[in-house]
């Protein structure tokens, strides 16, 4: 049987690293097993769901390279839900309830006050129906046998259904809650594996019985540990560190996906070139049960290491017009992200603002301009210029190199000066040294 996974976001906001991680794990598991990855838009909440977020989610997944084989929307499947709901109703597996939220809350407090679990108490079949009150609907759990399923990450999961409330599946206004439509979709789409956060474990227990009530075998479940921000690394909430922010910052998708695929597992986080590489090593047996700590700085480090090894052909179409392979190979060891390239290219071929130097530093760069003007310019220009300045001024180390770097590049640090000086050319180098000496 072919593996089928699904990612089921609600179009009420943009993707953040938490649900990107869930999407990635579903994608990688399907890819590793030659299966199908489905995007299911859970848009039953008509008030909060928007077409804009629907489009943005699909655009973000496309940017990440997590392209689904199929896209379905729950808002287009209400007829299917209605038909299956009526089948369960006829079988006595869903039933009407008439309590108000206030009545339910009062009963919950009473049970807790008695030291009892706040489990919903079913009403007698002959209980009178309140007049002029519409019902909500609950799924009737089978209390006669325990709920047991094997979780690919957490191992055997066992629940006593008597300690679970019959879950509400439909509101008074006829709108759907999450649990039942999700099961109906998974049956219809032949989903074989449900991969999601550990906060859904109890949902999976109830849903296991829903699958069986519909005459279907429950899928395999994998409940992964939740993602949390590494302490002290970022003041923002995890949810704000999402696709829009990452795209704006120029993070390479594969750098983010690399980190999200490996954190919380026993595998080291090392740069990879493609999703294929991540899929090969993806295995739920490597996942731990402790919270997975996400550190944005780790993404930045992986992104930089990725930059330092990217071939020119891999980035040619994303670089400014006229960018050369020589420029790329010279500058890439200093790039943190691709967006840094244009500014460094200006150092080679554009204009910079002359730096503010001390009196002694201005005298040094004035001498450097005179030396540079007399050189036969080559790949050895930087070495020849600094050797001559050491001999004539007696300066060395930072006292010599730092003012020259500032004057020639406008930067405190950067790539090796020999390559920069050779690439920017004699005329530009002399002009910059003279400008810095006069400021």
Where are these regions (language model features)?
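N-terminal Rossmann-like or analogous alpha/beta NTP/dinucleotide-binding catalytic cores
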Residues: 1-116, 203-216, 255
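Short, low-complexity, intrinsically disordered N-terminal peptides in bacterial proteins
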Residues: 1-3, 128, 438-439
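Short, histidine-centered active-site or binding-site loop motifs used for metal coordination
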Residues: 7-11, 41-43, 184, 188, ...
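Gly/Ser/Thr-rich beta-alpha loop segments that engage phosphate groups in nucleotides
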Residues: 15, 20, 176, 199, ...
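Hydrophobic alpha-helical segments in the ANL/AMP-binding
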Residues: 27-28, 61, 179-183, 404
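A secondary-structure boundary/capping signal
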Residues: 40-42, 74, 179, 222-223, ...
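Conserved nucleotide- and phosphate/pyrophosphate-binding catalytic cores
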Residues: 47, 51, 55, 184, ...
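Active-site cores that bind ATP or allylic diphosphates and position pyrophosphate for catalysis
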Residues: 96-223, 228-234, 242, 267
């Amino acid at each position: 049987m072919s593996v089928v996974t699904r990612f089921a976001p609600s179009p009420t906001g943009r993707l953040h690293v938490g649900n990107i991680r869930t999407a990635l794990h579903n994608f990688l598991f399907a890819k590793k097993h030659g299966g199908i990855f489905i995007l299911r838009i859970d848009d039953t909440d008509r008030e909060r769901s928007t077409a804009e977020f629907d489009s943005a989610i699909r655009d973000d997944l496309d940017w990440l390279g997590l392209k689904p084989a199929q896209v379905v929307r729950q808002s287009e499947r209400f007829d299917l839900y209605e038909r299956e709901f009526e089948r369960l109703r006829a079988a006595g597996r869903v039933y009407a309830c008439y309590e108000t939220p206030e009545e339910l809350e009062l009963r919950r407090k009473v049970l807790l006050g008695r030291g009892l679990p706040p489990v919903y108490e079913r009403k007698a079949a002959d209980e009178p129906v309140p007049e002029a009150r519409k019902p909500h609907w609950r799924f009737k759990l089978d209390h006669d046998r325990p709920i047991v399923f094997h979780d690919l990450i957490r191992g055997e999961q066992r629940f006593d259904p008597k300690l679970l409330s019959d879950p509400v599946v439909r509101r008074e206004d006829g709108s759907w809650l999450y649990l039942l439509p999700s099961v109906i979709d998974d049956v219809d789409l032949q989903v074989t594996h449900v991969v999601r956060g550990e906060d859904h474990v109890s949902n999976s227990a109830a849903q296991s019985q829903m699958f069986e009530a519909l005459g279907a075998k429950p899928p395999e479940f994998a409940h992964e540990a939740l993602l949390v921000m590494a302490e002290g690394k970022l003041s923002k909430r995890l949810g704000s560190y999402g696709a829009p922010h990452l795209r704006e910052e120029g993070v390479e998708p594969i750098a983010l996906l690399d980190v999200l695929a490996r954190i919380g597992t026993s595998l080291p986080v090392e740069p990879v070139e493609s999703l294929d590489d991540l899929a090969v090593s993806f295995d739920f047996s490597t996942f731990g049960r402790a919270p997975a700590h996400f550190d944005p700085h780790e993404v930045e480090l992986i992104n930089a290491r990725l930059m330092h090894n990217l071939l020119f052909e891999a980035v040619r179409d994303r670089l400014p017009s006229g960018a050369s392979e020589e420029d790329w190979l010279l500058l890439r060891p200093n790039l943190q992200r691709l967006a840094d390239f244009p500014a460094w290219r200006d150092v080679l071929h554009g204009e910079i603002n002359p730096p503010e130097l001390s009196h002694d530093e201005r005298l040094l760069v004035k001498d450097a301009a005179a030396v540079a003007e007399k050189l036969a310019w080559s790949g050895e220009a930087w070495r020849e210029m600094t050797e001559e300045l050491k001999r004539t001024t007696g300066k060395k180390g930072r006292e010599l190199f730092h003012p020259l770097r500032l004057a020639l590049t406008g930067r405190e640090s950067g790539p090796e000066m020999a390559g920069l000086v050779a690439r920017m050319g004699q005329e530009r180098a002399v002009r910059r040294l003279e400008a810095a000496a006069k400021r």
